[in-house]
Amino acid sequence: MQTADSRDLVLDRLWQHARARPSEPALYQKHSDGEWKALTFADYRDLVHRTAAACVAAGMPEGGSIGIFCENRVEWVLAALGAQAAGGLVSGIYMNSTDDQAVYILAHCEATIAVVDGPRQVEHLLPHLSMMPKLSRIVVLTEPDVASSFVSKPGLVVSWQEFLDSGKGHEQTVDERFARLTPDTLASLIYTSGTTGTPKGVMLSHHNLAWTARTGLSTFQVDRQDVMVSYLPL
């Protein structure tokens, strides 16, 4: 079995950077006050680990999945890497997807967790829960007290902070699953737009993602001084 020191997964790179330069900025996000605020590599790694523990707490098994139905934001990346660190995979859903397409993707990838922007997405998902039998958690990013709006579904609809807090006590399970990851482990299902029928899922392994990252860095000669802007939908 490969260890985290001998593998070269995207997650391994994050763990390495968090050890080597913990206080340097890894991500910037523009907040409502107009200020760009940094997330350091150490905090980035810690939040990914907490998210992974929350995925375990929500019942996501190894090989399980989460669906992300929100705009580009730091939590999108945390949810994706967190699920992968816990041995799961991630499927992104475009914000211009129809409700039927979103439900289809969540059902097809057998998502345990759906991460959504706000209550509107929740309201569109709830009537279709029977089509998504493995869905145990809907995490809402923009409403910190969202659970009070959906009291008929206790524990199903939670805020991002509640989701993170739920992972306490599951850290060792994350570490064990993280150690079992290999380059061939499935990391993502990317769905087509569905213009010619139902969306089709394309399987990508951790090796696929790592190779793409390494190739992009070398092709464009990106170094530590460069800042890249995330513009296209994740």
Locate the predicted segments by residue.
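Structural core segment of the AMP-binding/adenylate-forming
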Residues: 58, 85-165
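Conserved AMP-binding loop of ANL adenylate-forming enzymes
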Residues: 68, 208, 219-234
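Conserved structural elements of the adenylate-forming
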Residues: 47-50, 183, 202-223
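A short N-terminal helical cap/helix-turn-helix that marks the beginning
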Residues: 5-27, 46
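Conserved pre-ATP/AMP-binding loop-to-beta segment of ANL
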Residues: 22-25, 140, 157-162, 168-191, ...
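Flexible, low-complexity linker/hinge segments
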Residues: 1-9, 122, 126, 146, ...
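Conserved AMP-binding A3 loop
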Residues: 38-42, 178-180, 187-211
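Conserved AMP-binding/adenylate-forming core of the ANL superfamily
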Residues: 23, 27-81, 98-103, 159-164, ...
